[in-house]
A protein has these predicted regions:
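Conserved alpha-helix/loop element of class I SAM-dependent methyltransferases that forms part
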Residues: 20-39
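A short acidic, Gly/Pro-enriched loop at the edge of an enzyme's catalytic core
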Residues: 94-106
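Class I SAM-dependent methyltransferase SAM/SAH-binding core
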Residues: 40-96, 120
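Class I SAM-dependent methyltransferase Rossmann-like catalytic core
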Residues: 8-20
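Conserved Class I S-adenosyl-L-methionine
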Residues: 3-7, 22, 48-50, 170-266
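A short SAM/SAH-binding and catalytic strip from SAM-dependent methyltransferases
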Residues: 104-118, 141
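Conserved catalytic/acceptor-binding region of the Class I
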Residues: 119, 126-130, 134-204, 220, ...
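A generic alpha-to-beta junction signature in SAM-dependent methyltransferases
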Residues: 33-35, 59, 81, 129
């Protein structure tokens, strides 16, 4: 089994598994930021474009540069957001574009915990913001706030203890308010503030819950993909028994992200 590698390559599969929730969190994140209009934005790790689209629709930007190291994600986002205001680039956190005078706002959605060196990445972002500019990000609260993943890993590890190191909760200690605040403060940002952002995640049926785990994109789907058919069947059965549907057959859960923001000194 080689499920320790987080496979984030396939845009369509990501949309089914996580993208739909990412879009809703992106809206709440921007409502919290309340950014000034006509700003020049840089997005680090745009993925399939959930936050990119929200910035374009809700923040009235002058320009948006959205970058991601995955060519497949950049292609997916570019094809779904055809807008002259937005420029997509293939670039990682260690090779960020620059703008003369600096960007007004730099954001990163659901990315920081997957970076090899988050402190270096945040310092790099800070170095590309103008004085008085805003740096903000958000990550999933894997340890306590992502119910559909928390339940998945609880049952997966009960069946297969060797899966425990793949569980995003213990894997990503950065995804906690105190750790995020420390990360931003140590990067030299001022007025650092964290915020919880929570949405409902409703699945019409158990199959609607289970099917996205079969896409092979993301840590949990990558793990499922590594299992043989019998092991998948056992895990599916445990999850069905664990998840109590509502009277209409739907499964109603919640997902929480943790937002973090800070300013570059004027």
């Amino acid at each position: 089994m080689n499920a320790s590698i987080d496979n984030w390559a396939a845009g369509d599969a990501y949309e089914t598994f996580m993208g739909r929730w990412s879009r809703r969190i992106a809206d709440d994140f921007l409502d919290w930021l309340a950014p000034m209009p006509r700003a020049n934005w840089l997005e680090v790790g745009c993925g399939t474009g959930a936050l990119t689209k929200a910035v374009r629709q809700r923040a009235d930007p002058a320009s948006v540069v959205a970058c991601d190291p995955s060519p497949m994600f950049v292609s997916f986002a570019r094809n779904s957001i055809e807008d002259g205001c937005v420029t997509f680039l293939i670039a990682g956190a260690d090779d960020l574009p620059r703008r003369h005078g600096g960007f007004d706002v730099i954001v990163s959605g659901l990315v920081l915990n997957f970076l090899p060196q988050p402190p270096d990445a945040v310092r790099s972002m800070r170095g590309r913001i103008r004085r008085g500019g805003l740096l903000a990000a958000y990550v999933w609260d894997y340890a306590e706030g992502m119910q559909f993943l928390r339940i998945f890993w609880d049952e997966a590890v009960a069946l297969d203890p060797s899966a425990a190191p793949l569980d995003e909760g213990p894997r990503f200690p950065l995804c906690r308010p105190d750790a995020l605040i420390q990360l931003f403060q140590q990067a030299g940002l001022d007025s650092v503030e964290a915020r919880s952002l929570e949405i409902a995640t409703t699945f019409p049926s158990f199959d609607a819950y289970w099917s996205p785990f079969l896409g092979g994109t993301g840590p949990a789907p990558s793990y499922v993909d590594s299992l043989d058919r019998d092991a998948q069947r056992q895990l599916r059965l445990r999850l069905r028994q664990r998840l109590a549907p509502s009277a209409d057959g739907s499964i109603r859960l919640t997902a929480r992200a943790l937002g973090i923001r800070g300013l570059v000194a004027a």
